UniProtKB/Swiss-Prot annotation:
The organism of origin for this protein: Acinetobacter pittii (strain PHEA-2)
Family label: Belongs to the BamE family.
Positions where lipid (N-palmitoyl cysteine) attaches: 17
Membrane topology: Lipid-anchor
Sample GO molecular function, one term: protein-macromolecule adaptor activity
Positions where lipid (S-diacylglycerol cysteine) attaches: 17
Name of this protein: Outer membrane protein assembly factor BamE
One CC-aspect GO term: Bam protein complex
Listed Gene3D superfamilies: 3.30.1450.10
C-alpha cells in the first residue's frame, strides 16, 4: 500500500512540473531587411554595391550564381510572444544579375516590411529579458 501511495505522490509531483511550460528561444533565420534598405538597390548596380547595401545573400545558387536570394523568417520565443512581437514569414527578395554582374531585375520588394522587430533602425521596441 505504501508503494502505491509513494508512486502516486511522485507521479503527481512530476506532473505538476508541466504547469510552468517550456522556455522557447527566438528563431531568426536569414537576413533581416527593411523596406528602406531593400529600396536602395537599383537596376544597374553591380555585385559589390548590392553586397555593401544588403550584406551577403542568404542563398546563392551554385547552378545560377547570377541570382541572389535574401530570405528572412522569424519565429518568436517565450518572451517575444509575451511582448506580442509578431512572427515574420515569407520575406523573400530576389535580385537578378546579367553576365557582367549588373542588376537587371529585383523581385519581392512587396514582401519586405517597413521595419523589423529588434533591428537598430526599427521603430518597434527591442525585446529585453528581465534581470536574473
Amino acid at each position: 500500500m505504501q508503494k502505491l501511495v509513494l508512486t502516486l505522490l511522485v507521479t503527481s509531483l512530476l506532473a505538476g512540473c508541466s504547469i510552468f511550460g517550456v522556455y522557447k528561444v527566438d528563431i531568426p533565420q536569414g537576413t533581416p531587411l527593411t523596406k528602406a534598405q531593400a529600396s536602395q538597390v537599383q537596376v544597374g548596380m553591380n555585385f559589390q554595391q548590392v553586397r555593401f547595401l544588403l550584406g551577403s545573400p542568404t542563398v546563392t545558387d551554385p547552378l545560377n550564381p547570377l541570382r541572389w536570394d535574401y530570405i528572412y523568417n522569424y519565429i518568436p520565443g517565450t518572451y517575444a510572444k509575451k511582448a506580442k512581437i509578431p512572427a515574420a514569414h515569407g520575406q523573400h527578395l530576389k535580385i537578378y544579375f546579367d553576365g557582367t554582374g549588373t542588376v537587371t531585375k529585383i523581385e519581392g520588394l512587396e514582401t519586405i516590411p517597413e521595419s523589423q522587430p529588434g533591428l537598430p533602425a526599427s521603430k518597434e521596441a527591442i525585446l529585453t529579458a528581465p534581470p536574473l
